[in-house]
Amino acid sequence: MKTVWSFIGLHSRQPSGVFSGFEAAEDWIRRNKLSGTLSEFPLDVGTYDHAIANELFAPKKDHQNTPDFIADFSSRLDHFHYEDGARQ
């Protein structure tokens, strides 16, 4: 499975960088002394579908199959928090 790494700043609602590799992402975060979260996401598949296919999540309530729920769903494969460029 191919993945990408997405960085979202501490006070942001959208990614400020998307990287094909962890090392490139972390180098950029350190160099710019950024604070926020670096998250890994599967490529070419939604996180909701990925989580169900890999038995990481199973909808149990009706609302968990709605477009709003699916659009807000996140099952980041891995994630790291940073403060001023340093991993926490």
Residue ranges: model-predicted function:
Residues 1-15, 24, 34, 41-44:
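Short aromatic-glycine-(Arg/Gly/Cys) micro-motifs in beta-strand/loop hairpins
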Residues 3, 9-13, 22, 53, ...:
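Generic preference for well-ordered secondary structure
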Residues 31-88:
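Short, mixed-charge low-complexity intrinsically disordered segments
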